[in-house]
Amino acid sequence: GYHFPRRGLGGIKRSAPRAQEYGSFYRGYVSFTAAKPSKSRFDHNPSVFLLINSEDEDGDEVLLSGGLYMPSSRQLKAIRERIAANPAPFEALFRSKPFARSFPDGFSTERIATRPPRGFDREHPYLHWLKLQGFFVWRSYRRKEYTAVDFFDRVACDARQILRLNELLENAIAGR
């Protein structure tokens, strides 16, 4: 199952040189990452990431994301091959009402290649997914949302949708 690796818990205390640089011993944010243990030190498993940043100037002080942000080349190729061969499970996930309500934009286009990946059809109907270099979704919560009584239920619902995506990614990587 999922666990919080030691590196996955963002510390709030800064080192002495950083404290001098930023003027405070404490960071204005804290982050948590949960993932299944990886069998390889080069591959990372899909994860769930939560960031709470009190100093965010855009008002997106709480961020929830999940999926595979920086897949290894082996993982990237496996996911692309799965999408090229059978995009139906991903399409069904993104079309499902709970997932679409949580992540209406689908995969993030933050990390996308300019050209189609080598070995894939330039006319593939899901080329926009094949060009992705990271397979993750994210959403931010405004102050009105994260101060609401039902905020924890909302985050739990969104995290369950991320786990559905992570299962698809894990299956693609494992060749199942």
Regions found by a protein language model. Give the residues of each.
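Aromatic- and glycine-enriched beta-alpha-beta binding-site module
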Residues: R18-A85
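A contiguous pocket-lining binding segment that forms or flanks enzyme active sites
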Residues: G66-R118
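Gly/Pro-rich turn-and-neighbor structural signature
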Residues: G1-S24
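Long, solvent-exposed, polar/charged low-complexity segments
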Residues: P104-R176
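Glycine-rich loops and low-complexity Gly/Arg-rich segments
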Residues: P37, E57-D58, P89-F94, Q161-R164
